[in-house]
Swiss-Prot record:
Modified positions (N6-(pyridoxal phosphate)lysine) in chain numbering: K229
Protein name: Serine hydroxymethyltransferase
Organism: Halorhodospira halophila (strain DSM 244 / SL1)
EC number annotated for this UniProt entry: 2.1.2.1
Free-text function comment from the UniProt entry: Catalyzes the reversible interconversion of serine and glycine with tetrahydrofolate (THF) serving as the one-carbon carrier. This reaction serves as the major source of one-carbon groups required for the biosynthesis of purines, thymidylate, methionine, and other important biomolecules. Also exhibits THF-independent aldolase activity toward beta-hydroxyamino acids, producing glycine and aldehydes, via a retro-aldol mechanism.
Catalyzed chemical reaction(s): (6R)-5,10-methylene-5,6,7,8-tetrahydrofolate + glycine + H2O = (6S)-5,6,7,8-tetrahydrofolate + L-serine
Localization per record: Cytoplasm
UniProt GO molecular function: glycine hydroxymethyltransferase activity; pyridoxal phosphate binding
HAMAP family assigned: SHMT
One BP annotation, GO: glycine biosynthetic process from serine
Keyword field: Amino-acid biosynthesis, Cytoplasm, One-carbon metabolism, Pyridoxal phosphate, Transferase
Homology family: Belongs to the SHMT family.
Alphabetized CDD domains for the sequence: SHMT
Primary gene name: glyA
Amino acid sequence: MFSRDMTIAGYDPELAAAIEDERQRQEDHIELIASENYASPRVMEAQGSVLTNKYAEGYPGKRYYGGCEHVDVAEQLAIDRAKQLFGADYANVQPHSGSQANAAVFHALLKPGDTILGMSLDHGGHLTHGAKVNFSGKLFNAVQYGINDDGQIDYDEIQRLATEHQPKMVIGGFSAYSQVVDWARLRQIADSVGAYLVVDMAHIAGLVAAGVYPSPIPHADAVTSTTHKTLRGPRGGIILARSNPDLEKKFQSLVFPGTQGGPLMHAIAGKAVAFKEALEPDFKQYQEQVVANARAMARRVIERGYNVVSGGTDNHLFLMDLTPKNLTGKDADAALGRANITVNKNTVPNDPQSPFVTSGLRIGTPAITTRGFKEAEATRLADWICDVLDNMGDESVVERVRGEVEQICREFPVYG
């Protein structure tokens, strides 16, 4: 029999130390990885609940196991809240991740060997949008589009590629693009060749939910997303769509049993909590601040002489091109890490470096905004980044910036 008094610390001190060290790292470091955020204690409570014990293959009211009456309530709450939050007619909250959601949708709408048209990873896309190392580039004939010399999506190129290759699916969405996507234009292109339009809004789902970034749902046949990142929920995925009974049936069957078995009910409960939090009025204010902070940081690094791809940002992230400074993303990432500023190296368009080295940094503001940073703090942070990059190899600058970072982290704790 288990006791509620059982703890990891009392049984597995090595693991307990790793967890505590990570908690302390999150408090003492500034997090600028665009795909990371801090889940609320309520979300984490749901993920650590007894729902982790329950197997629930199937869907609410149609399970293959007994004893699902309570987890049915949790999943239905998540479904209903997701539909309300995004203005969707259909929601599947079972995908274990964004990639799993994409896999289910792709298998629902495509056959192996079909042509897909997605954004190149090198130009800001995602692995699951047709990268050769991913299932999407192995099972399907992937054609890739990119951005132009101004850092904007080249819609004329997409139309040309669509006309030439006649894809079965056009994919919108990105992992490192800082401008607003014209969903209506992508819909028009897809319609011109009789293709499905699928949008992966994993990075901007929170912005879309709050109405500070255009929603793809009115335009796409299916919309996928993660539930963490800007949504601040648990790690997981979701599929959304407008009313279409035929497609809904395909999506349902391709999530379960097509690509997954039992759903993670503790994670689904965490999604339900996160969607409720996102329906609160202050969530819109949070997302507006996320964008304001990203713009403030981008402006300052440009003022300090750094190149920002596309010249600015209209969402939660921007991409610094370090090529003119003769710096690599790998070296910049490491130097900033020593100053307790966590970023990620990232390829830039036409990057001469390998993906393990890169010529860029991706900067995102969801996590610092959760801490309470506003434009003033974001601007100071941009200055600290530039100070370190301007003085690569000077560890005294790294040490000074680390002290500043530790001080501001104490002023803005994650979990106060």
